[in-house]
Amino acid sequence: MTDEVKKLKKLIDGTDNIVFFGGAGVSTESGIPDFRSVDGLYHQQWDDPPETILSHTYYERYPEKFFAFYRAKLLCEGAKPNAAHLKLAEWEKEGKLKAVITQNIDGLHQAAGSKNVLELHGSTLRNYCEKCGKFYDVSYIKHSQGVPRCTCGGRIKPDVVLYEEGLDEKTLYRAVEYIQEADVLIIAGTSLAVYPAAGLVRYYRGHKLVVINKTPLDRGLGADLVITGAVGETLAQL
């Protein structure tokens, strides 16, 4: 255990008010590619860049191509929670962790047993008919052909926030509240490149800001503790 991890353990042991803010790097150890990493979706062969394909305009204009990309790249049905997801669920059960705020859409925090998860960008596990509102699970989307259709004939839209779409205000508001009231705030596996989610960190008022990331963050966060490494690998030591 490194000195940094020992310091983190001391912080965790001494509090019952942790808030965890995570991004794609939390799920890479479950085999889900990081959208922006060098070997992630950005650098894989496709006609248009992922940000274009995953935009509201593209979804409306080219639904067939949108769903082809969506099924191929964003639906990771076989993925299982890793050490990071499991440790966070354990902390929640112990009453130490108050909330997980995630930029991920894979539902792995809930699969690990976490109850209070704020999904800033929605979830691939929820899908709704745009016409009648009927719910469909991820398996239906995965195994449907072309543009998925409801029994009523309406198009089914994944409950994920696309580029050009706004984040759910209620979820954002709750995230701000948890961050403001946190004793220890852990930011992990995120480049903090996407707004408004990335802007949430500025609401933290405490002095126990921990950053766990494989690569150093560009932003001057004034972190009190920085650990360079994989999130699951790090949390598994605690």
Question: In which residue ranges do the predicted regions lie?
Answer:
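Conserved catalytic core of sirtuin-type NAD+-dependent deacylases
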Residues: M1-L238
